[in-house]
Curated annotation (Swiss-Prot):
Gene3D superfamilies: Phosphorylase Kinase, domain 1, SH2 domain, SH3 Domains, Transferase(Phosphotransferase) domain 1. The lineage of its organism: Viruses, Riboviria, Pararnavirae, Artverviricota, Revtraviricetes. It comes from Avian sarcoma virus (strain S1). This is Tyrosine-protein kinase transforming protein Src. One of its GO terms (molecular function) is ATP binding. Its EC number is 2.7.10.2.
Length: 568
């Protein structure tokens, strides 16, 4: 599969220390427009920094790439206001002869940005010109260029990043407020014996004069000044700001400019990860530079023409909880090239060594991530058709992403298209889809309910002891799986909502996402986060809930610090 030799990659995690870390560390879980390639070495530098500059500390994350780890802030967008000078947020090593390698902190002159995800740029440092991924840069001297600014990420995603046990107290980020347009939020990690590792959220308000404040007695002309101040003084916060929240390089939008239908010879299959009825999955390398996952389909599995048409739709689906489709080999045998997820399928992960250490908070969080990806599919009026743990992929930090969306519709195998053959996933399929072929987002909701049983049972096959024909008959008669062992009733109630006979009575994925993200949330700031219905929670379940988050308002410094009730 191609003779090109892979360049060794050493991706770095973005961890910065604004000041020496707190000793308390809590463990736990005129530019030429002709692109020319610069021969930059594949290394990472670690410059010293103060606020507004850039630094990085090398750290391997998953062994290959970091696209499957945590959500990276979405900073760059279309050029506005005539801005053409950008700063690099990450190192980037060129993948093709027309790419431009650059280092974090490098200033780049954008020649044009009409190419969408890949812009033609001229490095003011090296003098080289080439294409760059637009989401790796931000306008110079802008708030987007600050490493602590994470832009439009959700409260829940900020908590997922900050609750990494490796983060010391005071690890922080600044994000857009979800509830107040034009406002920001400072999210800070904290620790105490009552709640364990938790996150506090402080609303940053804007002055009419253009300044910012958390408490009105201490005002700042810029967010940079605010962050610099609270890095030295807690002054009512739960802790002074210590480290910028670590994150990783984002995925590029595609492998390179114009790299969609690629030659088979550009791929090297290296490690077989698994196989199924219709093909195999490999870890491999594209163009000798880029780690990818490659799904190979057996000839005859689906029409190449139909697949290519569907793939054009699939590549437009972009969400942090969907596995990114990078490229295709459209002649048989069809190859589907996606981002590589280091931990493999959720099903294998649950049944493997790591599965035994997963507790309810982690399982619910994984379910919430899947629901988030499917809520996006729902908004885009798309249907997955084969939602189950085997089609969810896991990366570092328990990041989960939905894979293989839409492919089931294209399979031409008779044992599959009959919908009752051995290859068809009857146990995950809604009755109206299995019996009449009515696949909708609501049949995906049914499948999500089955997936919840896979999570709570660590990968057990649904409907244990029953064959496919029996499952179909019993479900039509009203049978639903009972509550799995050690699963709270409130979660089983959610499963049963997903399994309502009338598809229109099933919840939306938007609802499922909100329910699961708030599953351990309490309205009182001092309470450990419990289930939506705490009365249905057992003592054993309560003992597992050791993480929480609050929105807090800083008060004037006093002998005893007081945190008000969370903001809505």
């Amino acid at each position: 599969m191609g003779s090109s030799k892979s360049k060794p990659k050493d991706p770095s995690q973005r961890r910065r220390s604004l000041e020496p870390p707190d000793s308390t560390h809590h463990g736990g879980f005129p530019a030429s427009q002709t692109p020319n390639k610069t021969a930059a070495p594949d290394t990472h530098r670690t410059p010293s920094r103060s606020f507004g500059t850039v630094a990085t500390e090398p750290k391997l994350f998953g062994g290959f790439n970091t696209s499957d780890t945590v959500t990276s802030p979405q900073r760059a967008g279309a050029l506005a206001g005539g801005v053409t000078t950008f700063v690099a947020l990450y190192d980037y090593e060129s993948r093709t002869e027309t790419d431009l390698s650059f280092k974090k902190g490098e200033r780049l002159q954008i020649v044009n940005n009409t190419e969408g995800d890949w812009w033609l740029a001229h490095s003011l440092t090296t003098g080289q010109t080439g294409y760059i991924p637009s989401n790796y840069v931000a306008p110079s001297d802008s708030i987007q260029a600050e490493e602590w600014y994470f832009g439009k990420i959700t409260r829940r995603e900020s908590e997922r990043l900050l609750l990494n046990p490796e983060n010391p107290r005071g690890t922080f980020l600044v994000r857009e407020s979800e509830t107040t347009k034009g406002a920001y939020c400072l999210s800070v990690s904290d620790f105490d014996n009552a709640r364990g590792l938790n996150v506090k959220h402080y609303k940053i308000r804007k002055l009419d004069s253009g300044g910012f404040y958390i408490t009105s007695r201490t005002q700042f002309s810029s967010l940079q000044q605010l962050v610099a101040y609270y890095s030295k003084h807690a002054d009512g916060l739960c802790h002074r700001l210590t480290n910028v929240c670590p994150t990783s390089k984002p995925q590029t939008q595609g492998l390179a400019k114009d790299a969609w239908e690629i030659p088979r010879e550009s791929l090297r299959l290296e490690v077989k990860l698994g196989q199924g009825c219709f093909g195999e999955v490999w870890m491999g390398t594209w163009n000798g530079t880029t780690r990818v996952a490659i799904k190979t389909l057996k000839p005859g599995t689906m029409s190449p023409e139909a697949f290519l048409q569907e793939a054009q739709v699939m590549k437009k689906l972009r969400h942090e909880k969907l596995v990114r489709l990078y490229a295709v080999v459209s002649e048989e045998p069809i190859y589907i090239v996606t981002e590589y997820m280091s931990k493999g399928s959720l099903l294998d992960f649950l049944k493997g060594e790591m599965g035994k250490y997963l507790r309810l908070p982690q399982l619910v969080d994984m379910a919430a991530q899947i629901a988030s990806g499917m809520a996006y599919v729902e908004r885009m009026n798309y249907v997955h058709r084969d939602l189950r743990a085997a089609n969810i992929l896991v990366g570092e930090n328990l990041v989960c992403k939905v894979a293989d969306f839409g492919l089931a519709r294209l399979i031409e195998d008779n044992e599959y298209t009959a919908r009752q053959g051995a290859k068809f996933p009857i146990k995950w399929t809604a009755p109206e889809a299995a019996l009449y072929g009515r696949f909708t987002i609501k049949s995906d909701v049914w499948s999500f309910g089955i997936l919840l049983t896979e999570l709570t049972t660590k990968g057990r096959v649904p409907y244990p002891g029953m064959v496919n024909r029996e499952v179909l008959d019993q479900v039509e008669r009203g049978y639903r799986m009972p509550c799995p062992p050690e699963c709270p009733e409130s979660l089983h109630d959610l499963m049963c909502q997903c399994w309502r006979k009338d598809p229109e009575e099933r919840p939306t994925f938007e609802y499922l996402q909100a329910f699961l993200e708030d599953y351990f949330t309490s309205t009182e700031p001092t309470a450990v986060h419990m289930a939506t219905d705490p009365g249905k929670y057992t003592t054993a379940h309560k003992s597992r809930a050791r993480v929480s988050s609050n929105t807090a308002v800083a008060r004037p410094a006093a002998p005893v610090r007081v945190l008000l009730k969370p903001s809505v």
